[in-house]
Amino acid sequence: MGTRRYIASKVLQALLTLAFVMVFNFFLFRVIPGDPAALLLRGTAAFNPQNVAEVTKELGLDKPLPQQFLVYAQDTLTLNFGDSFFLKGQDVKTVIGERIGPTMLLVATSTIASAALGLIIGIYAGWRRGSRFDVGSQGFTLFVYSMPEFWFGILVLMAFAGGIGPFPSLFPAGGYSTPGADLSGFGHVSDVLNHLALPWFVLVVAYMGEYSLIMRNSLIDVMNDDFVMTARAKGVREKQILWRHVVPNALLPTFTVVLLSLGFIFGGAITVEYVFSYPGLGLLTVQAIDSKDFPLLQGLFLLFSAAVIIANLIADILYSRLDPRVRAG
């Protein structure tokens, strides 16, 4: 299969998957118990049956389901998700846009750091299979890989910002920056990084184990290939075999997992942001669930799904460029 045809097929699959997600997103929030109009007016002086009926009509919920879907599809394609119930009067697109920056900073930097550390540990553990370093690193990475992010986050919060650990006030307990602080330039950057440190550390440790284990197993598989034995028989130095022949071939599976995890890390970021009160999309998701903010939840669900689909698409395309055998299959 040619490169263009392969990419076109993957793009088509991604678009079909995204279309399915849009349909699922529409029906999901219509089978959840609760009347959106009543939720919007609850707690206000205007909460009465007449006003609920009027709001139901304004939201278009009194129309037949096929007509509702057509309106929903048109609004979704134009990124019009309506107004938030939780943040009254604010457009969902604007709310998400304000929160996406902190989450992208957290997810992008933690992914790069965890991938780098995981690859290094996995390479040396696989190359020295059976050594003390291999056994010790496997135990550590398996532990952090199986550890829930929220539980580890609570421990880190207690140790470094909760007032009861060995370093009770080393870092802020939460937030994105110091409230009311008039900072600019390096002072602002330093303040943001100080608040980022603890949630960043939790995500790095949580995902480093996965990358390390995959890299180690992939490296061991490549070491059993015939070309490695041939290189050794020719007298090629061990370091040269490792870095020029084994590592490049072993990187492909790990590379794919790292790209795919860019989408799934948003899931881990939800719990971590909630623990540290970090004002990103994760904390916003929890707040939207608590308040049953259907328009906001629809926008967030679509965004998270699109992130996974796009990451999967990029991984498929780049993998096919690195390994042409994928296109042939």
Residues of each region from the PLM?
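Alpha-helical transmembrane segments of integral membrane proteins
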Residues: 2-6, 100-133, 179-329
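Hydrophobic alpha-helical segments of integral membrane proteins
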Residues: 3, 11, 51, 55, ...
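Residue-level signal for discrete positions within transmembrane alpha-helices
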Residues: 14, 99, 103, 139-142, ...
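Hydrophobic alpha-helical transmembrane segments of membrane transport/permease proteins
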Residues: 18-70, 160-189
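Juxtamembrane/transmembrane-helix interface segments of polytopic membrane transporters
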Residues: 21, 25-29, 153, 157, ...
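An internal, D/E-rich "acidic patch" concept
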Residues: 61-119
